[in-house]
């Protein structure tokens, strides 16, 4: 199979609509990650992946004995060699499979984009030597795969992400609470959902994770038509989660709809920021490499404070600089 049609003309980013037509979910994830890594060598982010893998930026309070002067000479930035307990991360991906994720106006539903994003993050982290797990939810928890780094883990994870989004309404509380109960070691929790759920209960569940020392990243996946409400003709609109239909003239409600959606998005983002969680709104038309880049930049900013929950610090990975 020749994946070149997924390359945007004149650029190196993958068009999501073309990407979703590529083979399996596992193939799509691998293609995004490998394309991303290759693109780093021809972009302003050249060398970024190496720094992310083996180093972290110096922050006040760090021991200057561990500064790597060779990296400073190449980049003119201060970096420290990562310790062993900083490089081994445990990540759990929480992916929304409720019926609202089945909506899509650009040839692929939100569910396919969300699954590809989750599989991409899993493929990237596994390549770093990190343990990755998965929890899918719709109303309640559907599937749970504990974080592991071993042969076959990525295959099991991507198989659980295949299939349609056909569960009941979005409820963010059960998956967040289950992760808080069963994941004892501090790690990374990534929530991938359209976040079309009440915000009031979200704060309590997220605070359980951040208070326990977990790093939390939230990706709100929305279709461009949901954001802009770009429909033109009056018609019957169906609520995918409740099944209710209502006759709507888009021209009449467009502005109020946009205002309410924006207010909801601000509430979700403010809740995340208040709790120290990273928040990203990702339209399904956005190239997945950019979402991956944002994820890596989050890890660069917060990696200095995230530590696995075990006593002591190891020797620097690869020896003292």
State where each predicted segment sits.
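A positional/architectural concept
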Residues: 45-51
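Short alpha-helical segments and helix-capping/turn motifs at coil-helix boundaries
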Residues: 51-54, 77
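N-terminal low-complexity, intrinsically disordered segments
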Residues: 65-75
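Exposed, interaction-prone extracellular/peripheral surfaces
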Residues: 1-38, 44, 57-62, 71, ...
């Amino acid at each position: 199979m020749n994946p070149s049609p997924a390359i945007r003309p004149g650029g190196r980013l993958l068009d999501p609509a073309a990407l979703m037509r590529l083979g399996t979910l596992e193939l799509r994830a691998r293609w995004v990650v490998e394309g991303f890594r290759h693109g780093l060598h021809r972009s302003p982010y050249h060398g970024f992946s190496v720094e992310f893998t083996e180093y972290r930026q110096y922050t006040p309070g760090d021991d200057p004995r561990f500064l790597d002067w060779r990296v400073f000479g190449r980049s003119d930035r201060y970096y420290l060699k990562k310790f062993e307990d900083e490089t081994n991360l445990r990540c759990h991906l929480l992916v929304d499979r409720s019926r609202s994720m089945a909506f899509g106006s650009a040839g692929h539903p939100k569910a396919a984009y969300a699954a590809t994003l989750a599989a991409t993050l899993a493929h990237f982290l596994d390549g770093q030597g990190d343990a990755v797990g998965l929890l899918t939810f719709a109303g309640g928890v559907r599937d749970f795969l504990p974080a592991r780094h071993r042969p076959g883990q990525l295959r099991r994870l991507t198989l659980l992400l295949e299939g349609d989004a056909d569960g009941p309404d979005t409820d963010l509380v059960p998956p967040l609470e289950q992760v808080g109960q069963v994941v004892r070691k501090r790690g990374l929790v990534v929530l991938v959902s359209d976040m079309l759920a009440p915000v009031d209960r979200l704060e309590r569940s997220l605070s359980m994770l951040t208070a326990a020392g977990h790093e939390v990243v939230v990706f709100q996946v929305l279709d461009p038509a949901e954001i802009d409400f770009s429909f033109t003709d009056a018609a019957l609109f169906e609520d995918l989660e409740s099944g209710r239909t209502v006759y709507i003239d888009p021209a009449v409600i467009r502005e109020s709809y946009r205002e309410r959606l924006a207010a909801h998005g601000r509430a979700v983002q403010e809740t995340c920021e208040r709790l120290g969680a990273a928040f990203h709104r990702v339209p399904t038309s956005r190239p997945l490499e950019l979402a991956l880049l944002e994820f890596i930049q989050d890890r660069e900013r917060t990696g200095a404070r995230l530590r696995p929950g075990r006593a002591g610090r190891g020797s620097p990975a690869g020896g003292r600089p």
